[in-house]
Amino acid sequence: MNDAKYVVVRSVQFKKGYKLAKKQGKDLPLLAWGVNQLAQDVPLPSNWKDHQLKGNMKQYRECHIGGYSDWLLIYEKRDTDLILYLFGTGTHAELFGM
């Protein structure tokens, strides 16, 4: 039974970040758990620091996967068509060029 409210759509950038995270040995089941929570419209734990981005990325939200300080998920919930759009995953430097 699939009780997800949102259909998950992965961007090319997210897919590349996912492959890199796999190569780096990151905890991919933890990422999958977070995506599943978001798809079911369940709030993430507070240590994930889920927040709205600002500036030219203000339509997206960002969270720290598992509470790690430098492993991020950038996403957008599109309520009009019930899509959870996964924009990217990676470190601040990988995602924002810092």
Language-model features: where?
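Enriched for short, Lys/Arg-rich terminal
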Residues: 1-7, 16, 23-28, 33, ...
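Residues that recognize and position ribonucleotide moieties
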Residues: 7-8, 46
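Residue-level signal for threonine
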Residues: 11
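Alpha-helix C-capping/helix-to-loop hinge sites
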Residues: 17-21, 38, 60
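Residue-level detector of alpha-helical secondary structure
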Residues: 30-37, 52
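A short, surface-exposed loop/turn module that caps and links secondary-structure elements
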Residues: 39-65
